[in-house]
């Protein structure tokens, strides 16, 4: 069975529906997304594999998901370090940073140096709303994630990938294939290029929303906020 996906326009519409008629706030959606990311990390990279996690955050909501995930990981016993070179304007991001500071989670401006001592990288730079071109410092950061032997988990999309067309034909990200991808709420069309472990996160959709957008939402086991889903991606770059 081919996994049904949702394009960028419908993903944005779905978020608006959740916050309008659904009654969710942005804070809630970001908290649920970040919790899902943290559970995916625990599933593929338990603390026994290494506790040093580098969380690369972009300026938008994808970066906010990364900040939330870092907080949860700190409570799980990991040692997250956050790379957050360009903070978004929403005051929510400042509050998320305060929560991390209160847990003594370090922030770094040296991505390469932190990468060299990390056991896992969370790519929370760009999500479903990304459109190029890449701006500094992110081309270099994406190239480093592309080249590293450290496993990478991408949030909603491997950064630099187009939501519809997948990886760029050339430049940073053209050969970027993270080991793990967690799609938030629903998978995006880019999953057909992905080859790795794929999770779905975001256990809060109503039956009406699922039917309206024609989504495939598998059953979540127990109290889990994530479910592993095979995308049968070609994975050829």
From Swiss-Prot:
It is found in: Cytoplasm; Mitochondrion. Its main location: cytoplasm. It comes from the Eukaryota. Catalyzes the epimerization of the S- and R-forms of NAD(P)HX, a damaged form of NAD(P)H that is a result of enzymatic or heat-dependent hydration. This is a prerequisite for the S-specific NAD(P)H-hydrate dehydratase to allow the repair of both epimers of NAD(P)HX. It catalyses: (6R)-NADHX = (6S)-NADHX; (6R)-NADPHX = (6S)-NADPHX. Keywords: Cytoplasm, Isomerase, Metal-binding, Mitochondrion, NAD, NADP, Nucleotide-binding, Potassium. GO terms for cellular component: mitochondrion. InterPro entries: YjeF_N_dom, YjeF_N_dom_sf, YJEFN_prot_NAXE-like. Binds 1 potassium ion per subunit. NCBIfam families: yjeF_nterm. The keyword Transmembrane does not apply. Signal peptide: none annotated. It comes from Ajellomyces capsulatus (strain G186AR / H82 / ATCC MYA-2454 / RMSCC 2432). Belongs to the NnrE/AIBP family. This is NAD(P)H-hydrate epimerase.
């Amino acid at each position: 069975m081919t996994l049904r996906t949702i394009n960028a326009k419908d993903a944005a519409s779905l978020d608006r529906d959740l916050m309008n008629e659904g009654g969710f706030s942005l804070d809630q959606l970001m908290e649920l997304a970040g919790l899902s990311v943290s559970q995916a990390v625990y599933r593929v990279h338990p603390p026994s594999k290494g506790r040093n996690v580098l969380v690369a955050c972009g300026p938008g909501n994808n970066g906010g998901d990364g900040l939330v995930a870092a907080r949860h990981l700190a409570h799980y016993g990991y040692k997250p370090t956050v790379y957050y070179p360009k903070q978004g304007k929403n005051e929510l991001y400042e509050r998320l940073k305060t929560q991390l500071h209160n847990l003594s989670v370090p922030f770094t401006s040296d991505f390469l140096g932190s990468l060299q001592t990390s056991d896992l990288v969370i790519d929370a730079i760009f999500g479903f709303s990304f459109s190029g071109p890449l701006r500094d410092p992110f081309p270099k950061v994406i190239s480093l994630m592309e080249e590293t032997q450290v496993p990478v988990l991408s949030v909603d999309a491997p950064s630099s990938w187009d939501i519809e067309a997948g990886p760029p034909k050339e430049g940073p990200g053209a050969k970027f294939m993270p080991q793990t991808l967690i799609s938030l709420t629903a998978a995006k069309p880019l999953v057909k290029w992905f080859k790795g472990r794929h999770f779905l996160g975001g256990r809060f959709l109503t039956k009406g929303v699922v039917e309206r957008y024609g989504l495939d939402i598998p059953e979540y086991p127990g109290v889990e906020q994530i479910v592993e889903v095979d995308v049968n991606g070609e994975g050829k770059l």
